[in-house]
């Protein structure tokens, strides 16, 4: 009985709640059908008390039986046409959806998301489509919460473009859609965005730490918060530190330790919170501001940028997407290890030289670091 009730409820919802021109025709016929059945009905109702008599007389319709019959069969015809049209339309739609590939890219590192894989979220949202997924898991390169083997982890990310190319070549460009979600160290999230910058259909999700689930970015809202810029001058004219405080403040003492006598540009949000990143518009706008700052540094003659970024995964990914691999200068995105004697021990180096792959760049051992170690 429960199964029968479920089938009836789902059928009613499909016929009377789903929006389509075909079902509009079906509903028009369904609304007229009972009216035609009532065309010849007549009845009398009386309510009698000691003091009054109330009666209701409903006479049969004066509409000729021929017109009632025409209306009856016409309503059935509308329902039949609408239902047949909707079935054909649904079959065609399902065939078109089956051609489409939704490629889910999940990256695991800082938090174990295996209990709520990204592919499950994608399957619920994109029902009927061909779902393909890949998981880049670098937890075997981590020890005690730090990245102990960055070169090994980097190899897994460099295969990402090949994985996408394999799947994209099997369908038309408009039928290929990427859904990205990760929780990995900032340099790898930035690199992932950089590698996928040429992909037009990318939906970016982030991990909601409060709900322990994947969450989509809001495409509409924007608090219009802007970066506040500060400058620390130094003698170097080729290399510069670009420090971005998005979700929390960067470690300025660690920057001084790892990059001494190097000029610094700091871009800071006043409201630095772990949940200040859910606006897609905000991320895109601030990514544009970041790139404009890089272009200004390039015009000033700096050709080696040391990027220190404190942000959520989706923000780092968005910033990486915005970084033009052909026209912007060499950049290294550094990993922060708070308890390490070298707080910024390594970074992922990205160059604009043709055919040059991103690589791991170790922090140079200076006199200040020697004293700290």
Where are these regions (language model features)?
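A short, acidic, amphipathic alpha-helical segment used as a generic capping/interface helix at domain edges
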Residues: 162-169, 283-301, 315-318
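Long, charge-dense
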Residues: 198-228, 270-279, 330-356
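N-terminal alpha-helical membrane-insertion module
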Residues: 1-97
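Gly/Ser/Thr-rich loops at beta-strand to alpha-helix junctions
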Residues: 108-112, 174-191, 245-250, 306-317
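N-terminal topogenic membrane-targeting module
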Residues: 58-78, 84-174, 185-186
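C-terminal functional regions that serve as terminal interaction/effector modules
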Residues: 298-300, 313-373
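Redox- and metal-dependent alpha/beta enzyme cores, enriched for Fe-S-associated oxidoreductases
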Residues: 223-292
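Hydrophobic, ordered structural segments
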Residues: 168, 172-213, 316-319, 324
């Amino acid at each position: 009985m429960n199964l029968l009730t479920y089938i009836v409820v789902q059928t009613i919802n499909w016929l009377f709640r789903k929006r389509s021109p075909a079902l509009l025709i079906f509903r028009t016929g369904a609304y007229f059908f009972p009216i035609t059945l009532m065309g010849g009905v007549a009845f009398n109702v009386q309510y009698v008390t000691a003091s009054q008599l109330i009666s209701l007389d409903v006479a049969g319709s004066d509409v000729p039986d021929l017109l009632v019959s025409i209306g009856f069969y016409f309503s059935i015809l509308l329902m039949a046409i609408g239902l047949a049209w909707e079935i054909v339309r649904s079959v065609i739609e399902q065939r078109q959806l089956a051609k489409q590939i939704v490629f889910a890219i999940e990256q695991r590192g800082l938090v174990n998301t295996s209990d709520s894989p990204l592919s499950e979220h994608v399957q619920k949202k994109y029902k009927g489509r061909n779902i393909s997924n890949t998981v880049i898991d670098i937890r075997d390169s981590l020890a005690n919460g730090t990245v102990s083997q960055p070169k090994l982890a980097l190899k897994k990310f460099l295969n990402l473009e090949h994985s996408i190319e394999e799947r994209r070549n099997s369908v038309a460009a408009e039928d290929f859609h990427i859904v990205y979600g990760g929780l990995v160290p900032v340099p790898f999230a930035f690199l992932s965005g950089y590698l996928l910058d040429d992909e037009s259909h990318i939906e970016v999700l982030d991990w909601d730490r409060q709900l322990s689930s994947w969450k989509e970015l809001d495409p509409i809202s924007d608090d219009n918060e802007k970066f506040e810029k500060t400058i620390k001058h130094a003698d170097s004219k080729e290399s510069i530190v670009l420090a971005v405080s998005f979700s929390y403040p960067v470690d300025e003492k660690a920057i001084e330790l790892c990059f001494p006598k190097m000029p610094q540009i700091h871009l800071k949000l006043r409201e630095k919170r772990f949940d200040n990143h859910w606006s897609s518009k905000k991320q895109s706008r601030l990514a544009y501001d970041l790139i404009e700052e890089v272009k200004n540094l390039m015009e000033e003659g700096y050709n080696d940028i040391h990027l220190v970024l404190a942000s959520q995964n989706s923000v780092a990914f968005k910033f990486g997407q915005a970084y033009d691999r052909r026209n912007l200068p060499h950049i290294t995105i550094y990993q922060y290890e708070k308890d390490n004697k070298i707080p910024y021990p390594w970074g992922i180096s990205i160059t604009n030289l043709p055919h040059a792959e991103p690589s791991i760049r170790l922090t140079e051992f200076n006199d200040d670091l020697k004293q700290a170690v």
